[in-house]
């Protein structure tokens, strides 16, 4: 049960969390009881904790509704340019606490729930994560929605309402087992179905060329039913919309065309159409060319573009004008951002609408299309790039294939004119790859069809320009940009680490929440011993809290005064959880060799999901759990070293582990992690980073000073040089006794005595086809880890470094990222107007910092 706050604690919780007025609390209690009674049809005698959660969620939602309606009215009145963020993933996590914070209701709700005799934290834990994403790409989309609303941009997130999100991970006998994530089982209080905006989406069929133009006919129709979720900005009364599409079979499905009397079977077959939005594909950084996935990609695109055009035509903007000239204004009113290539079919689909339906000439349609779209690239791993078989696209989307061919022809004509006789260049730059079966290179389609292409960190954008899409950036250098990723400080500081957020606010005020660059002001407190101790105390409280959580949920006991060394992210060879694992084995061997020697106690925590079909990633999990089994049960080791595999890592678990972390592991092979955003979350929450010069680590080192991160290992040039020379893993194995010992133990069954050859495939990979060169960085990594332990023994020096990192993390707010997208790509202006809640039709508004 929550304890009441003392007056001092209440004073410390400055208005970051909202003012608590008596009438405010009474109003919330009234709303809560009303919903319990009228919405849930329960009284306090029979209500369950879940009922209480839903009553609270509906009460908080009531405070969103007026602002939501008002925001949409305001956009209609003012007719600003709108941005549409298209993504197959939105990894939102939980909504309740984020909504309370952004509406300034958290303290009042806490008080109301306390007065009702309930425990706020217990209620928050009941909410299911909306796990509609795999990892970084989907979570980035969620952070971006928060920032776009906070910056007052007229923005819409468009995606799919998957019935089943990312699988729940269970560990059984050390192996990952997947379970379906039935996240909607109890209902979702935040969404509103909008059947009145249901739209048809077409598949298959054939193309007819007639006098009147081209027609796509004899198609199968699936209906797209939109569900809207409110996205509140931080204390600015703006509430934007995330619209997710659900697939529905039309009522005449399988009945109209061949009514052979099997009515029951026809109704049962409706499932086939509705499977489109059934489940999220659980691949991170890997392309799997399945027909159902292609259907998902087209489904979201086709429904969204109809909606965008409907809204454009209904807007007050130039509504007197006739269609043809009206579409000239389309790119002035609409920006569409493609989150990776997954929604790339939006390019041929918009062309199809303009040319076949709106009857625009090709050149005009293409000009508008290019001005409308922009593309974000998220990965340079070749196995992740989408390349759809022509044959599959021809079957599913015959008209789109024709349009893609036409786009390609005009594109290649242009190149041939610029580079006559350079046949190889034509082959490299074509949208169609010929070798090994014809495939469409979706990244090439996005580059050609967009006016801007961006990478997600400086180093990644450089690789995109100079290596992956070199030919394209030589052709149009101005098209290529960098937009370093960011994270929302609302969720990733205020929500998950209120103690630290309040400590910072006491020193520099509250404005940093909307302008994270103000964190540099903390540098003036580097000499303030009391402040350093307070920061350290907050970390210790978070570690204690997380230890208690681990003990309660996972039945694991850990030493809260040990260093918490954490690597949480998708399990992938390029992220090198194996390198971390080898370090754990090495520490274990050192303790065993000399148990009396001083050893800085560590709890190593590794968490993350492996794609269900990714054999090596699953074997890596089994290795981690097997090493943990040995290390954690060795009496000689005791509490000096523990290895925990954190089961079912997800957004709500990240919010618990990140504030408790001392050391953040960001150890991908240089040149493989596009940006990373977990690295930023740890930095903002007072962890130090051990990492390679990869992704955003490079810019973190630039902001904080390289001496304030633990940087080790090969740089991008070193990796290239090693590739050129030829990477021989055996050489490192022979030269480094501790590495040899660790590998031999894994190989000979020390960690799997019942199955001595359990890890032979893994060891074989490390020796003969390790693309990510684990052995090459082993020695530097272990040495760097020794430096970490050294510093940890000097708490004051450690805390100074922590404060320097927090003070340098301001650049990594997604607010900064979105301002750059708005300025450099979308041609939109953020607004600090606070929408007024009176519904006076003039769209009355005032500055957010005033009334």
Curated annotation (Swiss-Prot):
Gene Ontology annotations of biological process type: glycogen catabolic process
Subcellular location: Cytoplasm, Cytosol
Site feature Involved in the association of subunits, where: 109, 143
Sites bearing Phosphoserine, chain numbering: 15, 524, 561, 639
Enzyme Commission number(s): 2.4.1.1
PTM entry text: Acetylation, which is up-regulated by glucose and insulin and down-regulated by glucagon, inhibits the glycogen phosphorylase activity by promoting PPP1R3B-mediated recruitment of phosphatase PP1 and Ser-15 dephosphorylation. Phosphorylation at Ser-15 converts inactive phosphorylase b into active phosphorylase a. Dephosphorylation of Ser-15 by phosphatase PP1 inactivates the enzyme.
Key word Acetylation present: yes
Pfam families: Phosphorylase (PF00343)
Chief subcellular location: cytoplasm
UniProt note on regulation of activity: Allosterically regulated through the non-covalent binding of metabolites, being activated by AMP and inhibited by ATP, ADP, and glucose-6-phosphate. The activity is also controlled by post-translational modifications including phosphorylation and acetylation.
CC per GO annotation: cytoplasm; cytosol
Binding site for AMP: 43-45, 76, 310
Keywords in alphabetical order: Acetylation, Allosteric enzyme, Carbohydrate metabolism, Cytoplasm, Glycogen metabolism, Glycosyltransferase, Nucleotide-binding, Phosphoprotein, Pyridoxal phosphate, Transferase
Subunit record text: Homodimer; enzymatically active. Interacts with PPP1R3B; recruits the phosphatase PP1 which dephosphorylates and inactivates PYGL/glycogen phosphorylase.
Name of this protein: Glycogen phosphorylase, liver form
Function, as annotated: Allosteric enzyme that catalyzes the rate-limiting step in glycogen catabolism, the phosphorolytic cleavage of glycogen to produce glucose-1-phosphate, and plays a central role in maintaining cellular and organismal glucose homeostasis.
Organism phylogeny: Eukaryota, Metazoa, Chordata, Craniata, Vertebrata
Gene label: PYGL
Keyword Transferase: yes
Leading EC class: transferase
Cofactor(s) the protein needs: pyridoxal 5'-phosphate
N6-succinyllysine: residues bearing it: 364
Site (May be involved in allosteric control): 156
């Amino acid at each position: 049960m929550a304890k009441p706050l003392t007056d001092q604690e209440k004073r410390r919780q400055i208005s970051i969390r909202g003012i608590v007025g008596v009438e405010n609390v009474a109003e919330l209690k009234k709303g809560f009881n009303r919903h319990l009674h009228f919405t849930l049809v329960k009284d306090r005698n029979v209500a369950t904790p879940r009922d209480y959660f839903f009553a609270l969620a509906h009460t908080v939602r009531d405070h969103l509704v007026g602002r939501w309606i008002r925001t949409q009215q305001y956009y209609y009145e003012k007719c600003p340019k709108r941005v549409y963020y298209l993504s197959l993933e939105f990894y939102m996590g939980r909504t309740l606490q984020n909504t309370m914070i952004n509406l300034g209701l958290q303290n009042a709700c806490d008080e109301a729930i306390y007065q009702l005799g309930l425990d706020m934290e217990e209620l928050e834990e009941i909410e299911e994560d909306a796990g509609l994403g795999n990892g970084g790409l989907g979570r980035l989309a969620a952070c971006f929605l928060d920032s776009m609303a906070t910056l007052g941009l007229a923005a819409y997130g468009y995606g799919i309402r998957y019935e089943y999100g990312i699988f729940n991970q269970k560990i059984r006998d050390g192996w990952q087992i997947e379970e379906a994530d039935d996240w909607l089982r109890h209902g979702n209080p935040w969404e509103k179905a909008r059947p009145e905006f249901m739209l048809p989406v077409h598949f298959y069929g054939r193309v007819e060329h007639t006098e009147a133009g081209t027609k796509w006919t004899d198609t199968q129709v699936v209906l797209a039913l939109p569900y809207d979720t409110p996205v509140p900005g931080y204390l600015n009364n703006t509430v934007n919309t995330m619209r997710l599409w659900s697939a529905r079979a039309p009522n005449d499905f399988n009945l109209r065309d061949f009514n052979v009397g099997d009515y029951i079977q026809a109704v049962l077959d409706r499932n086939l159409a509705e499977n489109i939005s059934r489940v999220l594909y659980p691949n991170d950084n890997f392309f799997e060319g399945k027909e159902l996935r292609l259907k998902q990609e087209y489904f979201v695109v086709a429904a969204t573009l109809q909606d965008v055009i409907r809204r454009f035509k209904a807007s007050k903007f130039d509504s007197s004008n006739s269609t043809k000239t009206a579409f000239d204004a389309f790119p002035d009113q609409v920006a569409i951002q493609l989150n990776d290539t997954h929604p790339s079919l939006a390019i041929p689909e918009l062309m199809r609408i303009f040319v076949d339906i709106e009857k625009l000439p090709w050149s005009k349609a293409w000009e508008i299309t290019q001005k409308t779209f922009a593309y974000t690239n998220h990965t340079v791993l070749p196995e992740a790039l989408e390349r759809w078989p022509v044959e599959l696209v021809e079957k599913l989307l015959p008209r789109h294939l024709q349009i893609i061919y036409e786009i390609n022809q005009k594109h290649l004509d242009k190149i041939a004119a610029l580079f006559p006789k350079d046949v190889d260049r034509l082959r490299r730059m074509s949208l169609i790859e010929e070798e090994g079966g014809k495939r469409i290179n979706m990244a090439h389609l996005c580059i050609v069809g967009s006016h801007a292409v961006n990478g997600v960190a400086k180093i990644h954008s450089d690789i995109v320009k100079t290596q992956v899409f070199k030919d394209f950036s030589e052709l149009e250098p101005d098209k290529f940009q960098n937009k370093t990723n960011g994270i929302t400080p609302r969720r990733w500081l205020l929500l998950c680490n209120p103690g630290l957020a309040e400590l910072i606010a006491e020193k520099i005020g509250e404005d940093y929440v909307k302008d994270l660059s103000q964190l540099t002001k903390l540098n003036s407190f580097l000499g303030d011993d009391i402040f350093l101790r307070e920061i350290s105390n907050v970390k210790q409280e978070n570690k204690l809290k997380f230890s208690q959580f681990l003990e309660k949920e996972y039945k694991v006991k850990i030493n809260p005064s040990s260093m918490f060394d954490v690597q949480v992210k998708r399990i992938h060879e390029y992220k090198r959880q194996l390198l971390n694992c080898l370090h754990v084995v090495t520490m274990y061997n050192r303790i065993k060799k000399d148990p009396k020697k001083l050893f800085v106690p560590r709890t190593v925590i590794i968490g993350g999901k492996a794609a269900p079909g990714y054999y090596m990633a699953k074997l890596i999990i089994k290795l981690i759990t097997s090493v943990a089994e040995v290390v954690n049960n060795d009496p000689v080791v005791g509490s000096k070293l523990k290895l925990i595999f954190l089961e079912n890592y997800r957004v709500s678990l990240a919010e618990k582990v990140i504030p408790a972390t001392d050391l953040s592991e960001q150890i991908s092979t240089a040149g493989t992690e596009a940006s990373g955003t977990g690295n930023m979350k740890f930095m903002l929450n007072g962890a130090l980073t051990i990492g390679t010069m990869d992704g955003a680590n490079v810019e973190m080192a630039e902001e904080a000073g390289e001496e304030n991160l633990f940087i080790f290992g090969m740089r991008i040039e070193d990796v290239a040089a090693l590739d050129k020379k030829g990477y021989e893993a055996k050489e490192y194995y022979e030269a480094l006794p501790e590495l040899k010992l660790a590998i031999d133990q894994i190989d000979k069954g020390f960690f799997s005595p019942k199955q001595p050859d359990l890890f032979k495939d893994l060891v074989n990979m490390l020796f003969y086809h390790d693309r990510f060169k684990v052995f090459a960085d082993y020695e530097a990594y272990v040495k760097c880890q020794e430096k970490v332990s050294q510093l940890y023994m000097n708490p004051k020096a450690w805390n100074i470094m922590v404060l320097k990192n927090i003070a340098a993390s301001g650049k990594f707010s997604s607010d900064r990222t979105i301002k750059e997208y708005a300025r450099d790509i979308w041609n939109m202006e953020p607004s600090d107007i606070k929408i007024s809640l009176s519904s006076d039709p003039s769209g009355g508004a005032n500055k957010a910092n005033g009334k």
